[in-house]
Regions:
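Conserved lysine of the Walker
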Residues: 49
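Short beta-strand-centered segment that lines the nucleotide-binding/catalytic pocket of NTP-utilizing
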Residues: 62-77
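NTP-dependent small-molecule kinase module
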Residues: 133-134, 174, 196-237
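Conserved nucleotide-sensing/catalytic segment adjacent to the nucleotide-binding pocket
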Residues: 79-120
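ATP-dependent NMP and nucleoside kinases share a basic, alpha-helical "lid"
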Residues: 126-179
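Hydrophobic positions on the alpha1 helix immediately C-terminal to the Walker A/P-loop
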Residues: 52
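Short, Lys/Arg-enriched N-terminal segments with co-localized hydrophobic residues
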Residues: 10-33
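P-loop (Walker A) phosphate-binding loop of NTP-binding proteins
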Residues: 44
Length: 237
């Protein structure tokens, strides 16, 4: 993997693989060819993945769409709520990655998708979906994103966001309580029993599969370089 200091050389030497998607031109009734680049953003819980992803989305609001791997947690309608709380959500099997792969392929082909929505407070998939249209840049974010070789194959650029372990757990507690309405005791218990051990088993090893390693989601140098790369890709038409 590459670190922050490798960015200039990396982006001068390496061009992201680009696929061409064909979309229906609603205004002219024809089709247009559109370059599509998929960028994967991964890293441990609370590392700053979402911060980094949101900064990129904000920089290119009209050209970037975001897919969150978390929304692909399996539907658990047949499991009682108390039992859902005990599920190991930090294991790859907890995610319906087959559906994610299918959706990424559709987006690359210029097709829209109906993305599932996950309800963290209920530990279950919502019955609602989000309509997602393909765009020039597709950001895919998730803790376990790189564990599946099919996903890695679809990603043109792979970014791993790193952060100190203590900093990550503090961020997770704050986020899950304030943003996801979860119980503090449950958060701490989950971290000790599944999040921490699964991080070292599945997440951290993926650091070596990343093209770029970013130290913190608020790393301005890394953000500026990735933003410049995206700008270059958008100007290639």
């Amino acid at each position: 993997g590459y670190t922050d200091t490798d960015f200039p050389a990396l982006f001068l030497a390496r061009k992201a693989m680009v696929c061409y998607t064909v979309q229906r031109n609603k205004h002219k009734g024809g089709t247009i060819r559109m370059k599509c680049t998929i960028i994967g953003i991964t890293g441990g819980t609370g590392s700053g993945k979402s911060t980094f992803t949101n900064r990129l989305k904000k920089a290119f609001p009209d050209d970037v769409t975001v897919i969150y791997h978390d929304n692909y947690y399996r539907c658990q309608d047949d499991i009682p709520f108390e039992e859902r709380k005990k599920v190991n959500y930090d294991h790859p099997d907890s995610l319906e990655t087959d559906l994610l792969v299918e959706h990424l392929k559709k987006l690359k082909a210029g097709e829209s998708i109906e993305c599932p929505v996950y309800d963290y407070s209920q530990h279950n998939r919502s019955h609602e979906t989000i309509h997602v249209e393909p765009k020039r840049i597709i950001l895919v974010e998730g803790i376990l994103l790189l564990t599946d070789p099919r996903v890695r194959e679809l990603l043109d650029i792979k970014i791993y966001v790193d952060a100190d372990a203590d900093e990550r757990i503090l961020r997770r507690i704050t986020r899950d309580v304030k943003e996801r309405g979860r119980d503090l005791d449950n958060i701490v218990d989950q971290y000790l029993t599944t999040v921490k051990p699964m991080h070292y088993l599945y997440v951290e090893p993926m650091r070596n599969r990343a093209d770029i390693v970013v130290n913190s989601g608020m790393n301005d140098v890394a953000f500026d370089v990735v933003r410049a790369k995206i700008r270059d890709l958008l100007e290639e038409d």
